[in-house]
């Protein structure tokens, strides 16, 4: 398959990708609000012979491409792209930059453009493949709700059962380089909201209060010791306090304090140990300060660990190596998290063991090489979720499109494709 995938891509008219990408980039929409974005995707899909189903779980879309007799044992492959943006003010200075206070600061505009490119390739080259390919455009990835929303809206019953689940994401790195690995690739994530219920009083009479601010401060300090003292050094865990708030007046001891903790792990047993330790610390600090009310502990925005299938990796990675050569490299584990894995997990153990998630570098190569030579990669290269994050379009969209086609054709490509 790999020997001619570039020829297949190059024979397909993808000249529309630049204008499409510029349009999405200049009109970013937040999680759950992707109405205009979804409309542009549906309009582009209208050019292809596919079954399109929209408004799944909000603004989710699937396009089902079938080639051959569905009764045959040909493979069914699902490839997903996320489509939502972030509440980030863009500072790239690009002439197509967003001006609405939101931004495609995580590259979802690139993901959608590349997946539509794959759709064009499938439609224009039906003599080169056989099977079923599902292009899934997912809303609300950034808040962790989109995949579950599509599943809750009946996704499994509305599409053919996939044999393989694929996704990709752009990251800082030399534009056009593809990074892949087997095993744990993205961390699992939990957000934990903790509310300490104290007793309010006048600021001049702290002895009549149960001060939740003090308790919350002690909790934050104690949380810092969990990873260093309870998680083995050979394991990975992060527990970061992202929110700490209490009170609104200088002379009132408040009745409540709120803490939000974000946790990341690569292993389910470590996750359970970390979460249990957090709950233990919260309750113990409340007890130590005489808090009589049970603290409120709420888990939300859970993202499962992204664990790449060894079998799928073994089939797709040789295609990447053949097409990209030295530009196909080993990925490292990332501490970021994703909700994509909820989709294969909805199909049980078979789905859980049949997914692959890879990365594509998007930084201008000269910028990356200069920063590497100066030893300033972590300080000077714009990263995802930054207002300065701007992919180098041409090499990035080409690599994303070719990587998508290579991975899909590894399963549905016919002899000589």
Residue map of PLM features:
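Conserved hydrophobic/aromatic beta-strand scaffold that supports enzyme active sites
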Residues: 62-64, 193, 357
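Local beta-strand N-terminus motif with an aromatic residue
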Residues: 74-75, 161-163, 353
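Divalent metal-coordination and catalytic microenvironments
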Residues: 24, 63, 79, 108, ...
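Active-site beta-loop-alpha junctions enriched in small/polar residues
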Residues: 29, 82-84, 140, 171, ...
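Acidic/His- and Gly-rich active-site-bordering loop/insert found
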Residues: 2-104, 109-117, 121-130
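Metal-dependent amide/peptide-bond hydrolase catalytic core
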Residues: 214-417
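Histidine/acidic-residue-rich, glycine-tolerant segments that coordinate divalent metal ions
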Residues: 86-88, 93-103, 109-110, 127-243, ...
């Amino acid at each position: 398959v790999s020997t001619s995938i570039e020829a297949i891509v190059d024979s397909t008219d993808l000249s529309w990708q630049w204008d499409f990408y510029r349009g999405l980039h200049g009109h970013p929409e937040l999680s759950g609000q992707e109405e205009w974005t979804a409309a542009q995707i549906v309009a582009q899909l209208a050019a292809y012979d596919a079954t399109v189903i929209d408004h799944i779980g909000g603004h989710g879309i699937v396009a089902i491409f079938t080639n051959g007799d569905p009764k045959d044992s040909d493979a069914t492959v699902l490839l997903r792209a996320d489509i939502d943006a972030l509440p980030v003010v863009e500072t790239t200075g690009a002439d197509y930059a967003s001006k609405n206070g939101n931004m495609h600061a995580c590259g979802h505009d690139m993901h959608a453009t590349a997946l539509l490119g794959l759709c064009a390739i499938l439609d224009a080259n039906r003599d080169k493949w056989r099977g079923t390919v599902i292009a899934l455009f997912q809303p609300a990835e950034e808040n962790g709700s989109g995949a579950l929303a599509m599943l809750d809206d009946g996704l499994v019953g509305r599409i053919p059962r996939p044999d393989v689940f694929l996704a990709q994401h752009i990251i800082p790195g030399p534009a056009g380089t593809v990074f892949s690995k087997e095993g744990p690739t993205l961390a699992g994530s939990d957000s934990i909201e903790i509310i300490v219920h104290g007793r309010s009083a006048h600021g001049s009479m702290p002895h009549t209060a149960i001060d939740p601010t003090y308790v919350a401060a002690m909790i934050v300090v104690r949380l810092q010791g969990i990873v260093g003292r309870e998680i083995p050094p050979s394991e990975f865990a992060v527990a970061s306090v992202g929110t700490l708030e209490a009170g609104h007046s200088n002379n009132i001891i408040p009745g409540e304090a709120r803490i939000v903790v974000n946790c990341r792990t690569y292993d389910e047993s470590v996750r359970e140990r970390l979460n249990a330790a957090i709950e233990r610390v919260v309750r113990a600090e409340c007890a130590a300060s005489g808090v009589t009310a049970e603290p409120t502990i709420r888990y939300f925005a859970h993202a499962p660990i992204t664990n790449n299938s060894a079998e799928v990796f073994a089939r797709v990675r040789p295609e990447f190596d053949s097409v990209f050569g030295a530009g196909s490299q080993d990925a490292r584990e990332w501490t970021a998290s994703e909700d994509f894995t909820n989709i294969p997990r909805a199909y049980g153990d078979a789905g859980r063991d049949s997914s692959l998630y890879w990365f594509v570098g998007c930084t201008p190569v000269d910028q990356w090489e200069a920063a590497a030579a100066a030893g300033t990669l972590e300080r000077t290269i714009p990263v995802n979720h930054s207002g300065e994050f701007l992919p180098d379009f041409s090499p990035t969209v080409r690599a994303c499109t070719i990587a998508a086609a290579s991975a899909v054709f590894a399963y549905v490509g016919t002899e000589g494709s």
